[in-house]
């Protein structure tokens, strides 16, 4: 600021000097000393810049408030300039004082003021001198620093020289290495060339192998087509023989009619027109038969041509494929054996017919012969051919037209042919015997039914049908309306008796008044039975009549003793003392609230109270859930199976049974000291597997089975021990013991989308630096879960809200806001509904052998709240 003011003051003084100089020149000129040719300076002199400069000088001086700054500024003004300005101001002031009488200032006052200004200027000069000395010291320090930097610069230059020398040596080494690299590249090019040649040879060999495979497939297809053509040819020949026999029968019928006409011509002359019409009808039928015969002949010729073409193609294939020539010749000589070997692994229900065909076809009254083995096997394999629909349509059309596809071998003088005009149509093939054996005996397999599709229908049935169901099906279709409705043994046949039968069926006459000795003699020892608790219960024999009447009474009418016995069997024996005092009948428990149970029965344990409430609710709604069939002892074994044995004591103490598993909430698990998020998910997936398998106690597999054919529907039922066995089978036996107590089972592996191979590696304590081992585990894990579950896990990982599953994540209870404080008294601990695995309305849709889609379709694990378990404390 001071320097700017000094510069401005200096510029103003210089301008004032110039102005004063110009003024003097003007005064000289006004005195007449200038040349006559020069113009007056007043003509170009402008007083306004001087005024502006004086005003700027005043403003600059006003800005300098401190006297030291003003003194420093005055010390910088040149002496002549200051003297001139002083004189100029004194002259102007004297003129002003001379012209204005109002000014009272004297020269003494001005002198005193100037002396004060001088002192301030001296002070400013001393300050500036001190500043100059300080600047000199700084300059000396900077010179010392400069010398030090110069020394460092010299040292750096020396190091640079050394670095240049080392760099030149490195460059020489680099050149040597470049030459070696070039040599290695040449060698690499040679090796790559050899590798390409080897790959080319291998590719050609693979192409040859692929061509051989295609040729083998074509040969198999041609062999299959040849068998089909042969079967068609045989069937056509059989139809031709049948048609020829029908033609012969029609000829015999025509001859018989002609003889009858010749004998009765004289007696029945009035019916001549009717006979002509009958003859015309017979002629038309004969013509249709002849046309059908011609059609069959034409088809035989077409099939013969196709067979010849096939033989030519077979010869070409035999020429192109030398090693398969022997196989083709063997197949040509023995087509039945070759086709049976080709179909060794494809078993169809026709084999049941092959086993029971001889005794069923042994009736001498039935014309059609038994089908050969090759024919049945060929029919069983027609699913593999592209002409299956044609074959089916042909067989159905034949039967709809009334043509039997197999030749009838009955003699011409058979009474059956004498009674029926159309022997080819299905009808009453054998008369009924008096004892009804014909109606009960199964028909022959070789005989066509009313629709002509018995074998086709059998081919489409499942392999689980037994012989009885097949025989009933065939008998119902072949005998038409003759046989009665014989339904197989169904559950409808075991209906409960109604009315008085139901009442008499419940009464047992026995010597004992308490229990059935006959059933106890055959019964096995079981938990909770009479033989297992043979102490106090068998001694209660006083109220035998009341117990008899109580046996089938509803729960509301149970006596106090029976309710107490039920509580003992239920695992809540510690509350029997209070129950004897409070419970008067079963109706007391049915109408009791959880608060009443806590107050009157002393049930302080929330899960005991929940167990009793659920049991009473199930009895009140009259529904018997499968989850109530097993007790808390089974639940402890189930915890072993899912890999969480560390919680057995808590679950056993809380008496958690299968019904409670359905209604377990997040708060219940937290009360059971299950705080790990991974363990919550493990229990959730395990309960879901129980839901899908209808709470089958043996749904979890503990022992390894066939390792080659593993599907996700089987893996989802693996126990923790089975997963450890799988780890041993994939060469990770040393890490398998780490899964004990981890909660990893098949349901968690398949159903939890966030459980990946990395999660399993983390649970197995495989170090992250062992990348090959982790990659091996991930590969085996993806092959185990299948492509569907793998794709679902990848989509879950790709979602923006994905958080990886860790072993340290904890589940915290839900934090209630201010709006929930009013509901704290209304909803207690055991009344929450945030179930760990909510029950679906379609729990019973999927069986234990349901595929993986059934598990996923019922799975409640896709909720987005899963990702925030460790924050809100709920799973579903």
Curated annotation (Swiss-Prot):
Species this protein is from: Homo sapiens
Note on domains (UniProt): The N-terminal coiled coil regions mediate homodimerization preferentially and heterodimerization type beta/beta. The C-terminal, non-coiled coil regions mediate heterodimerization type beta/alpha.
Protein name: Liprin-beta-2
GO biological process: neuromuscular junction development
Gene Ontology MF term list: identical protein binding
InterPro entries according to UniProt: Liprin, Liprin-beta_SAM_rpt_1, Liprin-beta_SAM_rpt_2, Liprin-beta_SAM_rpt_3, SAM, SAM/pointed_sf
Record's subunit section: Forms homodimers and heterodimers.
Taxonomic classification: Eukaryota, Metazoa, Chordata, Craniata, Vertebrata
GO cellular component entries: cytosol; extracellular space; presynaptic active zone
CDD domains: SAM_liprin-beta1_2_repeat1, SAM_liprin-beta1_2_repeat2, SAM_liprin-beta1_2_repeat3
């Amino acid at each position: 600021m001071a320097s700017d003011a000094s510069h401005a003051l200096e510029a103003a003084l210089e301008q004032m000097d110039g102005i004063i100089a110009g003024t003097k020149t003007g005064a000289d000129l006004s005195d007449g000393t200038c040349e006559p040719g020069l113009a007056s300076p007043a003509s170009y002199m402008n007083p306004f810049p001087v005024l502006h400069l004086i005003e700027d000088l005043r403003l600059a001086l006003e800005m300098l408030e401190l006297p030291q700054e003003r003194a420093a500024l005055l010390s910088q003004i040149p002496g002549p300039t200051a003297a001139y300005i002083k004189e100029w101001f004194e002259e102007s002031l004297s003129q002003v004082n001379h012209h204005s009488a109002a000014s009272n200032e004297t020269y003494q006052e001005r002198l005193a003021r100037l002396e004060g200004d001088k002192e301030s200027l001296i002070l400013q000069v001393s300050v500036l001198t001190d500043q100059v000395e300080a600047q000199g010291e700084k300059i000396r320090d900077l010179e010392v620093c400069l010398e030090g930097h110069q020394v460092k610069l010299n040292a750096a230059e020396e190091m640079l020289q050394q670095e240049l020398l080392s760099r030149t040596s490195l460059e020489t080494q680099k050149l040597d290495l470049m030459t070696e690299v070039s040599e290695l590249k040449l060698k690499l090019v040679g090796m790559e060339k050899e590798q390409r040649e080897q790959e080319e040879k291998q590719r050609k060999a693979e192409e040859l192998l692929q061509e051989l495979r295609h040729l083998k497939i074509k040969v198999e297809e041609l062999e299959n087509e040849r068998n089909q053509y042969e079967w068609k040819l045989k069937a056509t020949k059989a139809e031709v023989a049948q048609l020829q026999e029908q033609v012969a029968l029609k000829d015999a019928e025509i001859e018989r009619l002609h003889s009858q006409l010749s004998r009765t011509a004289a007696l029945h002359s009035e019916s001549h027109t009717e006979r002509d019409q009958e003859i015309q009808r017979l002629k038309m039928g004969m013509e249709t038969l002849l046309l059908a015969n011609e059609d069959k002949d034409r088809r035989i010729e077409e099939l013969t041509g196709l067979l010849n073409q096939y033989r030519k193609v077979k010869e070409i294939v035999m020429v192109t494929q030398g090693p398969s020539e022997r196989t083709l010749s063997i197949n040509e000589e023995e087509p039945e054996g070759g086709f049976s070997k080709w179909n060794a692994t494809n078993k169809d229900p026709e084999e049941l017919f092959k086993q029971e065909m001889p005794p069923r076809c042994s009736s001498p009254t039935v014309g059609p012969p038994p089908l050969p083995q090759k024919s049945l096997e060929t029919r069983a394999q027609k699913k593999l051919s592209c002409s299956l629909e044609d074959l089916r349509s042909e067989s159905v059309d034949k039967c709809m037209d009334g043509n039997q596809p197999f030749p009838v071998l009955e003699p011409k003088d058979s009474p059956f042919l004498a009674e029926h005009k159309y022997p080819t149509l299905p009808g009453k093939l054998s008369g009924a015997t008096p004892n009804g054996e014909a109606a009960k005996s199964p028909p022959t397999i070789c005989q066509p039914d009313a629709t002509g599709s018995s074998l086709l229908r059998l081919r489409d049935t499942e392999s689980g049908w037994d012989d009885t169901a097949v025989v009933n099906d065939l008998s119902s279709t072949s005998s038409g309306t003759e046989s009665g409705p014989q339904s197989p043994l169904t559950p409808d046949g075991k209906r409960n008796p109604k009315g008085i039968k139901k009442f008499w069926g419940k009464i047992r006459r026995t010597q004992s008044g308490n229990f059935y000795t006959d059933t106890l003699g055959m019964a096995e020892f079981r938990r909770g039975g009479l033989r297992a608790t043979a102490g106090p219960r068998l001694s209660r024999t006083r109220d035998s009549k009341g117990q008899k009447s109580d046996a089938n009474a509803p729960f509301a009418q149970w006596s106090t003793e029976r309710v107490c016995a039920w509580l003992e069997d239920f695992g809540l024996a510690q509350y029997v003392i209070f129950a004897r005092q409070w419970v008067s009948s079963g109706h007391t428990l049915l109408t009791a609230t959880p608060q009443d149970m806590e107050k009157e029965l002393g049930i302080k344990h929330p899960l005991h109270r929940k167990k009793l409430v659920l049991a009473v609710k199930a009895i009140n709604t009259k529904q018997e859930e499968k989850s109530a069939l097993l007790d808390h002892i089974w639940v402890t074994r189930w915890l072993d199976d899912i890999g969480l044995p560390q919680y057995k004591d808590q679950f056993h103490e809380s008496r958690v049974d299968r019904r409670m598993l359905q209604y377990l909430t997040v708060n219940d698990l937290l009360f059971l000291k299950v705080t790990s998020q991974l363990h919550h998910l493990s229990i959730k997936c395990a309960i879901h597997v129980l839901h899908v398998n209808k709470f089958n106690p043996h749904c979890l597999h503990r022992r390894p089975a066939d390792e080659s054919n593993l599907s996700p529907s089987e893996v989802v039922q693996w126990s923790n021990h089975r997963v450890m066995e799988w780890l041993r089978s994939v060469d990770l036996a040393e890490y398998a013991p780490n899964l004990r107590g981890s909660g990893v089972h098949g349901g968690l592996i398949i159903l939890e989308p966030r459980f990946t191979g990395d999660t399993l590696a983390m649970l197995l304590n495989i170090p992250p630096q062992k990348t090959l081992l982790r990659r091996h585990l991930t590969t085996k894990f993806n092959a185990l879960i299948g492509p569907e579950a793998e794709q679902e896990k990848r989509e879950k990982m790709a979602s923006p809200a994905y958080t990886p599953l860790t072993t340290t994540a904890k589940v915290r209870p839900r934090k209630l806001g201010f709006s929930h404080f009013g509901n704290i008294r209304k909803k207690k601990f055991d009344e929450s509904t945030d179930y760990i695995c909510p029950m679906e309305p379609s729990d019973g849709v999927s069986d234990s052998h349901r595929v993986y889609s059934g598990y996923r379709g019922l799975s409640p694990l896709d909720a987005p709240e899963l990702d925030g378990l460790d924050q809100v404390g709920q799973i579903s």
